[in-house]
């Protein structure tokens, strides 16, 4: 049975640093500015033999009803409701503040086990601040330094009585090379990217049926890459909502730079990337840059044109979108395009099906016999050109891997094959085997000539 811990506390006391420490990887943004964590984030935490689900929350600042700050508070309250126990973190160096005391009252009202965590306890000032916390009436403080990993043993001792007995990790015996059946059943990792305020979080909330991610008219509401689990028609998906990707020249704040880097990491971690565009401002320069990044990273691509409900004359526009996509994105011809409305919930099923189809294409292996037939036909219809009076010879092709589909063509002079002919092979192969929206890699490799040495000796 899963045990859930929520890390709570006022802003900038080190909650995300502790989250990263326990999850074992840098999933949450960490910065000196208060309010860096806006959404609640979840991860699988481990401390010794203790395994648990960990929730990182926004700090509870009071704000006007309906404001972004107030909705951050609602997210935190929801996380507390979901948790089995609370890690109440305060800054021992700063000592107790009125907000900490108000927060302690809030934690007590939750009627759940509370572990009081005195973070930043290094040095004499940290020791004094930790002693002050007895006034909160929440028991002995656990003194730690999340940044340096100090006090984890003491935190283990405090958590051990709260958690059920540890069980053996059954995943250790899983083979490294997964079968086709495993690929067909494991969760598909999906990153939803796009320019700020394209409606990414609104769409995921519609998919989940709850306001899991903060949404706001102001661009840049999502700062972290938020991972959520989704089940659709019996298939599991792990969906990452990311910070909007802007042009680097417009990224001014350090925090926004961290957010963009976080989004780029999500793209690299994903298997399928959904590029979400605003229907009223589509195929702008930054959209094309993002699509190019996805192709270079070798990920399957699906384009979601969101806020489609705001388009008045929709007839024929999808066909025009496909034409525009092939024009602007020739390196990923045939990319699937789905019109959606996160606000109205339209296009959800179509997009999820497109993601699943794109994942299948990304994993595709072409049968050897069919690949050989295509290769012979392709070079017969359009033979490689002559270079310096000598015709290039392409010998044979083989698929080296999937994810994305990658091939090697063995030939006589690899460095002499024009880029235009390589593009011809890629587009021909993509069309022959129905590989839309996924990068197709063809590498040229010279085949050793066993008679070259003999000819040299004879001459």
From Swiss-Prot:
UniProt binding sites for GTP 1: 9-16, 56-60, 119-122
Coiled coil: none
Keyword GTP-binding annotated: yes
Domain of life of the source: Bacteria
Positions of the KH-like domain: 364-448
Binding-site residues, GTP 2: 194-201, 241-245, 306-309
Segments traversing the membrane: none
CDD domains assigned: EngA1, EngA2
Example GO BP: ribosome biogenesis
Chain ranges of the EngA-type G domain: 3-167, 188-363
InterPro entries with a match to the protein in the record: G_ENGA, GTP-bd, GTPase_Der, KH_dom-like, KH_dom-like_a/b, P-loop_NTPase, Small_GTP-bd
UniProt entry keywords in alphabetical sequence: GTP-binding, Nucleotide-binding, Repeat, Ribosome biogenesis
Alphabetized HAMAP family for the sequence: GTPase_Der
PANTHER family: GTPASE DER (PTHR43834:SF6)
Similarity field: Belongs to the TRAFAC class TrmE-Era-EngA-EngB-Septin-like GTPase superfamily. EngA (Der) GTPase family.
Record's function text: GTPase that plays an essential role in the late steps of ribosome biogenesis.
Protein name: GTPase Der
Organism: Rhodopseudomonas palustris (strain TIE-1)
Gene name as annotated: der
